[in-house]
Curated annotation (Swiss-Prot):
Cellular component, GO annotation: periplasmic space
Name of this chain's protein: Tol-Pal system protein TolB
Described purpose of this protein according to its UniProt entry: Part of the Tol-Pal system, which plays a role in outer membrane invagination during cell division and is important for maintaining outer membrane integrity. TolB occupies a key intermediary position in the Tol-Pal system because it communicates directly with both membrane-embedded components, Pal in the outer membrane and TolA in the inner membrane.
Oligomer status and interactors: The Tol-Pal system is composed of five core proteins: the inner membrane proteins TolA, TolQ and TolR, the periplasmic protein TolB and the outer membrane protein Pal. They form a network linking the inner and outer membranes and the peptidoglycan layer.
GO terms under biological process: cell division; protein import
Length: 430
């Protein structure tokens, strides 16, 4: 836990104050069919009102996962704060087989002790399935809640939780000297801060695998350039500024390489930079356009978009050589693929019959499932645990962020009120 807080602390260097309207998750589909669970409001052990409603944050996290449906506090048969106070039969009567209880205790030094217990109400009724406590300052209370959520989620699903992750995205605001901003927020839209402001467009943010840096495209010099920015101190390193287009950066999972697309020789082609030496190697060539690289987990293969067959489709190529292999066959065109962290599937933008939606393709069976029904969907990015996808879509006259589970059942949006939001990128585990 202390290590996790140290990693996250690097982000605080860039925090001054939240100067912009934040995005917030609004669930649109899928909660009613999810597993019911009880998340009791955490008992506040101090005077006045608690600085954060920890139980509400944990409940929202579990609801946002699409796998749980926390019942309303008004429907709870009791509101215990410890496992010993839980009456299992009262909960199982409502079809609930697990309950989260907890407390928040203020300390004399100004910090807070957050504790929780996950209680089984059915199998081994009354037994504690998971428990923990964290001592944090006020500004880390939400992070402590997300940590509890991660532990509860993993215990109940066997899948690592991703509630302590963040998302990067580009916002185009209405007017001002610097209308283009690269921002980062918690996965749920809270704690938003600006990484970089620019008078010219910003595009395609991509996280380093340790979460300490973001690569992106900037047009501040009058032409496109690829840069890597360190979040802890704001330092910017330019990595590519060749003639014509420089775009679509993607860090390799092992953190040693950066893939991107350049059109310095005419057509767009894929290149890979060794981040240690700065050496650049060309991966694809020819007259077709090859772009939008996404790494497979082995850090040796790329999925990418190519129009070599006429319309854009997704291909796979080894960065050390060999013929590319076409991956996508369904739909009139497919592009903007993101490979899942385990390499078993990819999500992509699939166009067919005039519609443009996010689809999932199983890389073993080839089966394709359309996940979304929103309008002009773009730039999907998969959560590090592989359960959710964030993407951009058109709503009205603007662009907003949307969420969909990788099984297609849960859907939500993250509306913003101060501009168009595009190019979302989900962070690794932090």
């Amino acid at each position: 836990m202390k290590q996790a807080f140290r990693v996250a602390l690097g982000f605080l260097v860039l925090w001054a104050s939240v100067l912009h309207a934040e995005v917030r998750i609004e669930i649109t589909q899928g909660v009613d069919s999810a597993r019911p669970i009880g998340v009791v409001p955490f008992k506040w052990m101090g005077p006045g009102t608690p600085p954060e409603e920890i139980g509400a944050i944990v409940g929202a996290d579990l609801r946002n996962s699409g796998k749980f449906n926390p019942i309303d506090a008004a429907r709870m048969p009791q509101q215990p704060s410890t496992a010993a106070e839980v009456t299992p039969a009262a909960w199982t009567a409502l079809g609930i087989d697990a309950v989260v209880v907890g407390q928040v205790q203020p300390s004399a030094d100004g910090s807070y002790v957050v504790s929780y217990q996950l209680v089984d109400t059915s199998g081994a009724a009354g037994s504690v399935l998971a428990q923990n406590q964290y001592k944090v300052t006020k500004q880390w209370l939400r992070y402590a809640a997300h940590t509890a959520s991660d532990e509860v989620f993993e215990k109940l699903t066997g899948i690592k939780g991703a509630f302590r992750t963040r998302i990067a995205y580009v916002v185009q605001t209405n007017g001002g000297k610097f209308p283009h901003e690269l921002r980062v927020s918690d996965y749920d839209g809270y704690n938003q801060f600006v990484v970089h402001r620019s008078p010219e467009p910003l595009m395609s943010p991509a996280w380093s695998p340790d979460g300490s840096k973001i690569a992106y495209v900037t047009f501040e010099s009058g032409k496109s350039a690829l840069v890597i920015q360190t979040l802890a101190n704001g330092a910017i390193r330019q990595v590519a500024s060749f003639p014509r287009h420089n775009g679509a950066p993607a860090f390799s999972p092992d953190g040693t390489k950066l893939a991107f697309a350049l059109s310095k020789s005419g057509s767009l082609n894929l290149y890979v930079m060794d981040l240690g030496s700065g050496q650049i190697s060309q991966v694809t060539d020819g007259r077709s356009n090859n772009t939008e690289p996404s790494w497979f987990p082995d850090s040796q293969n790329l999925a990418y978009t190519s129009d070599q067959g006429g319309r854009p489709q997704v291909y796979k190529v080894n960065i050390n050589g060999g013929a590319p292999q076409r991956i996508t066959w369904e739909g009139s065109q497919n592009q903007n693929a993101d490979v899942s962290p385990d390499g078993k599937f990819l999500v992509l933008v699939s166009s067919n019959g005039g519609a443009q939606h996010i689809a999932k393709q199983d890389l073993v069976t080839g089966a394709v499932q359309v996940l979304t029904d929103t309008f002009l969907d773009e730039t999907p990015s998969i959560a590090p645990n592989g359960t959710m996808v964030i993407y951009s879509s058109t709503q009205g006259l603007g662009a907003v962020l949307q969420l969909v589970s990788t099984d297609g059942r849960f859907k939500a949006r993250l509306p913003a009120t101060d501009g168009q939001v595009k190019f979302p990128a989900w962070s690794p585990y932090l």
